[in-house]
């Protein structure tokens, strides 16, 4: 499914508040809801500074070549890319193909976010997404699982999202810097 939600823009709104584009790739309804909670958190914490847009792509539609290409172009122009999946051994091949495609398009993203349902310390999906972020030279944020020494998962997730919001705020403050202002 491909959705776009943009608030009504006046020219002064667009100049005062830059757009923050978020692409979400998700496995199913449950993981889509998890990703939307993260998106809503960002809107809640940065919504007064940015205009938000999102595109959502379900994993299974990424198997269709034309749709995969559109989704890859969306990801390449996004500021944040969120991948939300159930924990498993590997991401589906159609998702890896989509990732490879948006990497070829030279992403402008600032961050890649991984959201998973598992509670394990070891995660092949987490490792894969971390390597993708490294190749793309972007920040990687991951929902914490059972990390050694961590007991409260909710506080840890809120801390991770808070850091993500701070990084995005810093990246967009740089856009306002210059002699033309």
Map each language-model feature to its residues.
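Short acidic, S/G/P-rich loop/turn micro-motifs used as interaction or catalytic elements
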Residues: 29-31, 61-64, 83-92, 118-121
């Amino acid at each position: 499914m491909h959705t776009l939600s943009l608030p009504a823009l006046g020219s002064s709104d667009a100049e005062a508040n830059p757009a923050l584009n978020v692409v979400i790739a998700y496995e199913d309804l449950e993981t889509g809801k998890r990703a939307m909670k993260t998106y809503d958190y960002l809107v809640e914490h940065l919504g007064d500074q940015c205009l938000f847009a999102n595109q959502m792509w379900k994993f299974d539609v990424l198997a269709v070549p034309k749709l995969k290409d559109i989704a890859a172009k969306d990801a390449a122009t996004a500021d944040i890319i969120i991948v939300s999946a159930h924990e498993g051994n590997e991401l589906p091949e159609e998702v890896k193909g989509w990732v490879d495609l948006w990497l070829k398009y030279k992403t402008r993203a600032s961050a890649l976010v991984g959201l998973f349902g598992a509670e394990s310390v070891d995660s092949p999906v987490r490792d894969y997404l971390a390597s993708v972020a490294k190749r793309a030279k972007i920040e990687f944020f991951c929902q914490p699982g059972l990390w050694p020494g961590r007991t409260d998962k909710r506080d840890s997730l809120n801390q991770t999202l808070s850091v993500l919001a701070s990084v995005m705020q810093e990246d967009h403050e740089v856009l306002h810097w210059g002699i033309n202002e």
